[in-house]
């Protein structure tokens, strides 16, 4: 796999999960920052259709609290973009809870288009935390990097 990096971030594949209880395959990457010798968070890419990932999104990320505010989630998404394109995707869905202002800003900085806010269906509620009742859904049109 080609090295995945963007600006101050490098991604390292932590795990590829091919099939778990009927879920689509997914990749888990550690987010590393060049200036720090330990992971600052994680980013996940979930293979599959828009319908499968309408509420969880194709991409999920978390940045550890001490490292927040440095745009690492944004940079990790950008580092992942070419890899996702290489898998045959031209767009992905990214979601966040309506009250997650940091994620909303990250997603909007990527240029993703807001689609709608929807309540999480009751049959999917077990996959989310108790406080997650709705999701803001965004469509991110991927761009091949021009050199």
Regions found by a protein language model. Name each.
Residues 1-7, 12-17, 23-147:
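Acyl-donor (CoA/ACP) binding surface of acyl/acetyltransferases
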């Amino acid at each position: 796999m080609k090295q995945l990096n963007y600006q101050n971030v490098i991604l390292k594949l932590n795990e590829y999960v091919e099939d778990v209880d009927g879920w689509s395959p997914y990749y888990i990457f550690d987010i590393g920052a060049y200036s720090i010798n330990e992971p600052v968070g994680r980013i996940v890419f979930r293979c599959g259709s828009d319908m499968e990932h309408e509420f969880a999104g194709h991409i999920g990320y978390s940045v550890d609290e001490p490292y927040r505010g440095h745009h690492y989630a944004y940079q990790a998404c950008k580092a992942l973009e070419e890899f996702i394109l290489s898998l045959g995707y031209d767009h992905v869905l990214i979601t966040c809870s309506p009250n997650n202002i940091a994620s909303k800003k990250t997603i909007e900085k990527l240029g993703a288009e807001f689609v709608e806010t929807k309540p999480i269906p009751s049959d999917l509620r077990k996959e989310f935390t108790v406080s997650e009742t709705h999701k803001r859904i965004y469509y991110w049109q991927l761009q091949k990097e021009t050199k």
